[in-house]
Amino acid sequence: MAIGLIGRKVGMTRIFNEDGASVPVTVIEIAANRVTQVKTLDTDGYRALQVTTGTKKANRITKPEAGHFAKAGVEAGRGLWELRLADGDGEGIEVGAELNVDIFADIAKVDVTGQSKGKGFQGGIKRWNFHAQDMTHGNSLAHRSNGSIGQNQTPGRVFKGKKMSGHMGAERVTTQNLDIVRVDAERNLLLVKGAVPGATNGDLIIKPAVKA
């Protein structure tokens, strides 16, 4: 079943495999994902599951949200996410059903999507890995500047999309082909090898790897 789930980044640690080697892992908490809507070709033009997870204070829930959750018969969660379905996936899943981390028990690799850490306004060296200029040898003002950004008298302008200084991070990022190290269904935890995007407690979308 190639269906994704919504999880929360707990943090990183390490575990030791059977050979005694240290394996860096990210711990992802995947509480039960409650299905709030099933989208079909007939009604929506495409197939998808809309899910929620976690909890939300009652005074933070808007009336439209409250009605939507009540119609589905599920507890209000901290957000709504939509997971596209390929042909043959998700058959038999109905509104109100719960999806748990054990659906990854037979999967070896996953893709993890999250929002990267925001780093504010950064220069070209940090943002785009530009080469720094000389620290000495006559250079006294342009050690970390971008260098030439223009053309000639023609076209006499800077092309759109030119890599320059600007806002870095806080964008949707996907890390692909992460190995699943352990699936702990009792504690709703998924351990994947390596790092995943975002800060601690950030929401993540975990899907079976498309390039596995």
UniProtKB/Swiss-Prot annotation:
Source superkingdom: Bacteria
Keywords: Methylation, Ribonucleoprotein, Ribosomal protein, RNA-binding, rRNA-binding
Residues annotated as transmembrane: none
UniProt key word rRNA-binding: yes
The record's account of how the chain is modified after translation: Methylated by PrmB.
Modified residues annotated as N5-methylglutamine in this record: Q153
Coiled-coil regions listed: none
GO cellular component terms listed in the entry, alphabetical order: cytosolic large ribosomal subunit
InterPro entries noted in UniProt: Ribosomal_uL3, Ribosomal_uL3_bac/org-type, Ribosomal_uL3_CS, Transl_B-barrel_sf
PROSITE patterns: RIBOSOMAL_L3 (PS00474)
GO biological process assignments: translation
Gene Ontology MF, one: structural constituent of ribosome
Family in the record: Belongs to the universal ribosomal protein uL3 family.
Quaternary structure annotation from Swiss-Prot or TrEMBL: Part of the 50S ribosomal subunit. Forms a cluster with proteins L14 and L19.
Cited function: One of the primary rRNA binding proteins, it binds directly near the 3'-end of the 23S rRNA, where it nucleates assembly of the 50S subunit.
NCBIfam families: L3_bact
Name under which the protein is recorded: Large ribosomal subunit protein uL3
Protein species of origin: Shewanella piezotolerans (strain WP3 / JCM 13877)
